[in-house]
Amino acid sequence: VEGREADVILEIPRDFAKSLGTGRPVELQISANSINGTKGGLGSSYLSTVVNDFVNQELGGTGMARLSVLNLYNPHLNYKVFMVPALLIMMLTLLCGFLPALNIVSEKEVGTIEQLNVTPLNKFVFILAKLVPYWIVGLVVLSIGLVLSAVLYGIVPSGSLWLIYFFSCIYILTMSGFGLIISNYSATMQQAMFVMFFFLMVFILMSGLFTPVRSMPDWAQWIAAFNPLTYFIQVMRMIFLKGCGLTDLWLQFGKMLCFMSVFAGVAVWSYRKTNA
């Protein structure tokens, strides 16, 4: 379960058969990954039913086998613990996706982009200057969200708070870079809004925010594999609920870093200082 190779397991003691033969009661334990409280609760419930049916059939329900359930990472199956970190991410996604997408295209509409284009300002510096404000705003909004989640719901990260900010910095720059790419290619604010809205809906619905990725059809899992939101949700839930450190998140870190580099690089490359 800790290695994410199984969601529900049944732990049987070594001396199970010997204990039954000597008439001693045995303890069986079901361990369930309850990060998703609904999924963990259903899985442990189904397995408990199977085990109890077996005990009643083979042992006649004599009380020789006692079954206990251990809900890992979310002992009370609290759905808020599962959803609040994801909602913080969705808030960051909408904020740091929509606003950058409207940035450059709004300057195209009012004509101020022409004044910037005639300056000797480097493209990299220009895009960086566009990214930094949303990076700061995103971190401020994240901080407010973390405070509210602690005050209103009593939900605090089990892992490092600084690690959350570290991954948030990467994700904010990723989504802001993607928004600037759309802004570079859009002619009007309405066009940028509709295009960004389409991509954000795909990102949110195909990220595991509401439905576990492994329960999706193959084509949806393929889309989720190329979705930066998928990996940030995994990171937030692993830090919030499992208390994971950076050594447990190397895979997500590498993929998020790739997304950030690609989107930021394309944002710089796609910006043109001429209208040709």
Segments predicted by a language model, with ranges:
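Short cytosolic juxtamembrane segments of multi-pass membrane proteins
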Residues: W269-A276
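Transmembrane helix boundary and interhelical loop/hinge segments in multi-pass membrane proteins
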Residues: R4, G97-T119, L131, A276
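Short helix-capping/hinge motifs at transmembrane helix termini and TM-loop junctions
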Residues: A101, V105-S106, L152-P157, S186-A187, ...
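Membrane-interfacial helix-loop-helix junctions in multi-pass membrane proteins
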Residues: Y73-L77, V156, G208-V262
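Alpha-helical transmembrane segments and their short interhelical loops
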Residues: K123, I127-F197, M201-I204, L246-F253, ...
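A cross-kingdom feature of multi-pass membrane systems that activates on extracytoplasmic/periplasmic
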Residues: N56-L77
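Long, hydrophobic alpha-helical segments
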Residues: M83-L102
